[in-house]
């Protein structure tokens, strides 16, 4: 999903930069507030960031100018919400661009918008809806992680289609082409990623269920019930 350095032409890379900055700034505010009020969650923040880094670094060649890989944002989205997830994603994307030749600086805004903003926001909305409907937490976590990945690639395909419309076919034709290529790798990758994140949540709930209550992810009764039953 990382679009390579210099691949997006102007004005598209500038547009994605401008659109991503306000969300990132709000995420910084939310992160600072959370750490001041609940410093005990710092280990979970670190783990969530590490999950994003490790999974999103497992890249496979895909569409010209981009790659396929898990995004790893599902865990952070559920624990901390999409705004803070955008900050963790930004840190990972910047490190990868500077030291791993994965992504780029001019394309940083586009990559952050897809992996760190729109994907997490859509997934978070689905997660909250499922929890309101009393869907099992582990099922909700699996669906959330899957959608965070898939939506990211829909956005990346849209970004590439807008920058490189097909002739003939225009933006729509280009979008279908990009989505078709991404789907080959991303459908199975997202399912594997979601399975891993769901297993991680099972461990976190057993070891740090109290922190999930502190973060308002689950209630005390939900944690007790999940500990007593198998997912």
From Swiss-Prot:
GO cellular component term, pick one: ATP-binding cassette (ABC) transporter complex
Q: Which GO biological process categories is it annotated with?
A: cobalamin biosynthetic process
UniProt keyword Lipid biosynthesis present: no
Report the pathway entry: Cofactor biosynthesis; adenosylcobalamin biosynthesis
Where this protein primarily resides, as one coarse class?
Answer: membrane
Where does it live in the cell? Cell membrane
Record-annotated membrane-spanning stretches: 9-29, 41-61, 74-94, 107-127, 135-155, 181-201
Molecular function terms from GO: cobalt ion transmembrane transporter activity
Identify the keywords attached in UniProt to this record, alphabetized: Cell membrane, Cobalamin biosynthesis, Cobalt, Cobalt transport, Ion transport, Membrane, Transmembrane, Transmembrane helix, Transport
In terms of superkingdom, the source organism counts as Archaea
Q: How would you describe this protein's topology in the membrane?
A: Multi-pass membrane protein
Q: Which Gene3D superfamilies match?
A: 1.10.1760.20
Claim: Kinase is one of the keywords in the record: no
So what does this one do? Part of the energy-coupling factor (ECF) transporter complex CbiMNOQ involved in cobalt import.
Family statement: Belongs to the CbiM family.
Tell me, how does this one assemble?
A: Forms an energy-coupling factor (ECF) transporter complex composed of an ATP-binding protein (A component, CbiO), a transmembrane protein (T component, CbiQ) and 2 possible substrate-capture proteins (S components, CbiM and CbiN) of unknown stoichimetry.
Recorded hits in NCBIfam families, A to Z, give: cbiM (TIGR00123), PRK08319.1 (NF006184)
Q: What is this protein called?
A: Putative cobalt transport protein CbiM 1
Where is the organism placed in the taxonomic lineage, from the top? Archaea, Methanobacteriati, Methanobacteriota, Stenosarchaea group, Methanomicrobia
- What gene is this protein translated from? cbiM1
């Amino acid at each position: 999903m990382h679009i390579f350095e210099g691949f997006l032409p102007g004005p598209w890379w500038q547009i994605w930069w401008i659109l991503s900055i306000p969300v990132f700034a709000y995420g910084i505010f939310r992160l600072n507030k959370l750490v001041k009020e609940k410093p005990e969650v710092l280990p979970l923040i670190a783990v969530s960031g590490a999950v994003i880094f490790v999974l999103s670094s497992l890249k496979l060649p895909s569409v010209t100018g981009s790659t396929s890989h898990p995004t790893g944002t599902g865990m952070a989205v559920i624990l901390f919400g999409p705004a803070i997830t955008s900050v963790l994603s930004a840190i990972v994307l910047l490190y990868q661009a500077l030291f791993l030749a994965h992504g780029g600086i001019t394309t940083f805004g586009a990559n952050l918008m897809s992996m760190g903003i729109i994907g997490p926001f859509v997934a978070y909305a689905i997660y909250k809806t499922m929890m309101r409907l009393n869907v099992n937490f582990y099922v909700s976590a699996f669906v959330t992680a899957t959608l965070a990945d898939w939506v990211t690639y829909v956005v990346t395909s849209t970004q590439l289609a807008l920058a490189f419309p097909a002739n003939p076919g225009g933006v729509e034709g280009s979008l279908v082409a990009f989505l078709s290529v991404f789907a080959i790798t991303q459908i199975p990758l997202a399912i594997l990623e979601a399975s891993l994140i769901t297993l991680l949540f099972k461990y976190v709930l057993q070891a740090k269920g109290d922190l999930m209550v502190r973060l308002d992810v689950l209630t005390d009764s939900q944690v007790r019930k999940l500990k007593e039953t198998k997912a």
